UniProtKB/Swiss-Prot annotation:
Cofactor annotation: FAD
Family in the record: Belongs to the methylenetetrahydrofolate reductase family.
Organism annotation: Arabidopsis thaliana (Mouse-ear cress)
Gene encoding the protein: MTHFR2
Sequence positions that bind NAD(+): E21, F22, F23, P24, P25, K26, T52, W53
A biological process term (GO) from this entry: methionine metabolic process
Name the UniProt record assigns to this protein: Methylenetetrahydrofolate reductase (NADH) 2
Amino acid sequence: MKVIDKIQSLADEGKTAFSFEFFPPKTEDGVDNLFERMDRMVAYGPTFCDITWGAGGSTADLTLDIASRMQNVVCVESMMHLTCTNMPVEKIDHALETIRSNGIQNVLALRGDPPHGQDKFVQVEGGFDCALDLVNHIRSKYGDYFGITVAGYPEAHPDVIGENGLASNEAYQSDLEYLKKKIDAGADLIVTQLFYDTDIFLKFVNDCRQIGISCPIVPGIMPINNYRGFLRMTGFCKTKIPVEVMAALEPIKDNEEAVKAYGIHLGTEMCKKMLAHGVKSLHLYTLNMEKSALAILMNLGMIDESKISRSLPWRRPANVFRTKEDVRPIFWANRPKSYISRTKGWEDFPQGRWGDSRSASYGALSDHQFSRPRARDKKLQQEWVVPLKSVEDIQEKFKELCLGNLKSSPWSELDGLQPETRIINEQLIKVNSKGFLTINSQPSVNAERSDSPTVGWGGPVGYVYQKAYLEFFCSKEKLDAVVEKCKALPSITYMAVNKGEQWVSNTAQADVNAVTWGVFPAKEIIQPTIVDPASFNVWKDEAFETWSRSWANLYPEADPSRNLLEEVKNSYYLVSLVENDYINGDIFAVFADL
């Protein structure tokens, strides 16, 4: 979806939009850390996030990769910066085609800074001289597909700011006229350069309106995190620093925490003033840091840590090709990135109902599904690599996870227990103690308010429902006991399969069981999570392979612990259990006296 449409839609509802900017890190570890940070920040619901294009096009490939992952894996509306520096038209079109094929609709069109080692911008052969040319090219070749954002400079472009820190009135007016040309050429949104004098920004907005620029103008806010970095950035951008800001910073410049606290205070007060003057959107330059940006938004009452809303039980995709997707199998609940990877080749995505089995079109299992950020790999090493002498030792690790003592799990891309799991963690501990090794679960829910902090989704003024669900590994003997117990519990359905494809089930292969649904005003019933045998048959390969790829392989070859884990993988069954009576049923009754 175009950012301009999202901003205008929120404005029509009387809401203020906010967004974050990130830049490509220099190291692989830095990229991993950035995506973990993005995951946390995107949970607060930014309207979009953008990723910069390195000076001189130095990060072109990485920017393209990060933008695509933001849109398709982090699931946030993404805007990619695109510059003219060192970019002949063929490279520009390659970048645009790449993001279009990945479902991205938003571009920030810039001239760009001079290449490394040069003082002035030089047009590359076969390329463009300015952002206006880039806007014209995008509109002429790609029509209305892309939303185009351009940069605005409240103090004028740094190139025309003199040694005295000011641009002449003639240069400032010329800059405004050039900005209007970019809008007239097809740009539909302006995001400004950083500033610290709010009055300058408000004057800039008024000056734009006076010459006929009517599109939204979004202020770019850069929280002060570090004194030297602040001076370096304002010096590079030739940004005016108000006297009172320097006076406040000077006594605390060597106290980094005090500088950050002042930066949060200043950013908050700047935003309050702009919001009071009718600004409807804020863009935060994060410098890949989260605390200051989030603190400002919390101070403004725009986000609340205790009320992170979800449109669905899983994060809704931002990819233009998946925006209507609203049904998924529960099996990948803790591995959403893997699910997105394995379904990226689909031409249509389920909407409203799961429909016919589509197992044949799941992507093949590959190394990609088991690749992990180094930080997560390290966490698994620290928490899960212990001497394992018996199955009881394995059970102990699962119990520790249910107790909340572990922040990682080989079967999860998420951190620790999810809020709804904590509702049933005492029962889960007992189940794991009996040798049923749980990897996925949800409690039963009967008409809980949709804004509940633990199980809510879909926004306010609705009610959500869940059937209790449990997924676990167990031995053949324990499975036989479960099957026997279920004969006296007709509301429970089960499926079980081992690595050798031996099935045990009391459901038909074509059965599709909705296990989560919601009721909202003026809408049909939404059922975003289902259980179906065909998808379970696909998932089971990934679940069994996780024993090796994400746990056993952390040990040296021939290590007894590694061998034990492989034995469990090769002999245990994966079991899916649903308690269909979500009002009076008790899924844990299956395990009583076992």
